[in-house]
From Swiss-Prot:
Protein species of origin: Mannheimia succiniciproducens (strain KCTC 0769BP / MBEL55E)
Function field: CRISPR (clustered regularly interspaced short palindromic repeat) is an adaptive immune system that provides protection against mobile genetic elements (viruses, transposable elements and conjugative plasmids). CRISPR clusters contain spacers, sequences complementary to antecedent mobile elements, and target invading nucleic acids. CRISPR clusters are transcribed and processed into CRISPR RNA (crRNA). This protein is a sequence-specific endonuclease that cleaves pre-crRNA at G21 into mature crRNA.
Matches recorded under CDD domains: Cas5_I-C
Record protein name field: CRISPR pre-crRNA endoribonuclease Cas5d
GO molecular function: endonuclease activity; RNA binding
Keywords: Antiviral defense, Endonuclease, Hydrolase, Nuclease, RNA-binding
Biological-process GO terms, alphabetical: defense response to virus; maintenance of CRISPR repeat elements
Similarity field: Belongs to the CRISPR-associated protein Cas5 family. Subtype I-C/Dvulg subfamily.
NCBIfam families xref list: cas_Cas5d, CRISPR_cas5
Cofactor note: Does not require a metal cofactor.
InterPro entries hit by this protein: CRISPR-assoc_prot_Cas5, CRISPR-assoc_prot_Cas5_N, CRISPR-assoc_prot_Cas5d
Gene: cas5d
Residue stretches in coiled coil: none
């Protein structure tokens, strides 16, 4: 498939936060399609394209660890934002993290590795001379050189993601999952956010089959809002 890319990613820790956990972060069992898309976009993205995640290969056993992380205690208040808008100045619209830092517990993933299989689609912002092949080749060149617009991360910025492009003719890295770990119902998982319709989250039933999660299309019937 000429329009396909496969990217091997790995890291010491990861946290793909479940939205239903309000106070302390708890990670999903594996990377979400939206987080995978974010990693690809950190390497190459333009308004002309969207990355579509097709498959996620889970290469290492799912292991959790409890840690404590420094987080900002509160968001900037709505009244401060409204005041800045009225004044037409953002001079006072800031927060000092040293004054509002809190330690919070988090349940994160340890020693993770995946292969992201994805393709690109053109958006309405694409120029007449643009096509998916052009952007796929740009992505491959950047990934081979280790280039990125910003450091890809495993859910949160303090957990960097290392990456390596897998050529179309190269085999996938060997999975370290045991026989009993290859097939597993992972429950409902965030697919992505529909930014064009009120930032609505979409969810799908994630199932690990032979170590692979098949990601349905964003507007498929099995994807729920």
């Amino acid at each position: 498939m000429a329009n396909r890319i496969r990217l091997h990613i790995w890291g010491d820790y990861a946290c793909f936060t479940r939205p239903e956990m309000k106070v302390e972060r708890v990670s999903y069992d594996v990377i979400t399609p939206s987080a995978a898309r974010g990693i690809l976009s950190a390497i190459h993205w333009k308004p002309a394209i969207n990355w579509v995640i097709d498959k996620i290969y889970v290469l290492k056993p799912i292991r959790f660890e409890s840690v404590r992380r420094n987080e900002l205690g509160a968001k900037i208040s709505e009244s401060k934002v409204s005041g800045a808008m009225k004044r037409k100045s953002v001079a006072d619209l800031y927060t000092v993290i040293e004054d509002d830092r809190q330690q919070r517990a988090a349940t994160v993933l340890k020693d993770v590795a995946y292969v992201i299989e994805a393709h690109a689609v053109m958006t309405s912002k694409a120029g007449v001379d643009e096509n998916t092949t052009k952007h796929i080749e740009m992505f491959k060149r950047r990934a081979l050189k280790g280039q990125c617009f910003q450091q890809p991360c495993m859910g949160v910025r303090e957990f960097p993601a290392h990456f390596a492009l897998i050529d179309d003719n190269d085999p996938l890295p060997l999975s370290q999952l045991s026989e009993s770990e290859f097939n597993r119902d992972l429950g409902w998982m965030l697919h992505d956010i529909d930014f064009e319709h009120g930032n609505t989250p979409h969810f799908f039933r994630a199932e690990l089959k032979n170590g692979v999660i098949d990601v349905p299309p964003f507007y498929a019937e099995e994807v729920k809002r």
